Amino acid sequence: STYELAISEPLPDEPHALPQIAPYLVSRFYQERNGEYSRSTINKGIQTQVEDLAERWSNEFGRSDIRNLAILVIDIPSNQVVAYCGNVHFDRKQGGNQVDVIQAPRSTGSILKPFLYYAMLQEGSLLPDMLLPDVPVNINGFTPQNFSMQFEGAVPASEALARSLNIPAVTMLQRYGVPKFHSFLQQIGLKTINRSSSHYGLSLILGGAEATLWDVTNAYAMMGRSLLQLPQRSCSLLLPT
């Protein structure tokens, strides 16, 4: 009978929690797309590796009271986002862990230096082996210092960039022009650098501005595509449905 067949069926196993993969991206999609069905460009294998990496470094940085970090990975040839880790410990309600750090403006620090080198290389006003001065300077009262608090004299441009030296970067920006560099940064999509160039001044190259990891990573991907002579196109998070 139906009853006998029913009671002979084994009981289902206890339900398990569904895996949480890219929860910050899922939350973003939910807010921006109102729950509409979406297919992301995320590579599950890479995403899992990135989340494990973020968890491991979160434990390491936690000893220095650093509670938030994010990782964004873009595949240059396809220009698709393959990993999106907006923060760590999504399930925690404290310490800002539910903030998607990828979308949150942060001080640019030294991360804009490669864009200045790129812009000057592209126009031919800089060569990789060109010697740059790393000496004490005073520009209208602005006296930049290197992190080491030391001076190297004359340094090849490639080495100055690799070592993230501040003084060569400032003198290069002075030569290139703050308004011109400010315009270039806006052209490559750094939308949060939205005040006048005079507001930032030469400190623009030393962390005097804010940008999101999303915009900065997309700009680096643009630079990579340019160097590989690939056509420029917008970075994608979604696959066709």
Cite the ranges covered by each PLM segment.
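A short, well-structured edge-of-sheet supersecondary motif
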Residues: 2-5, 64-94, 183-188, 237-240
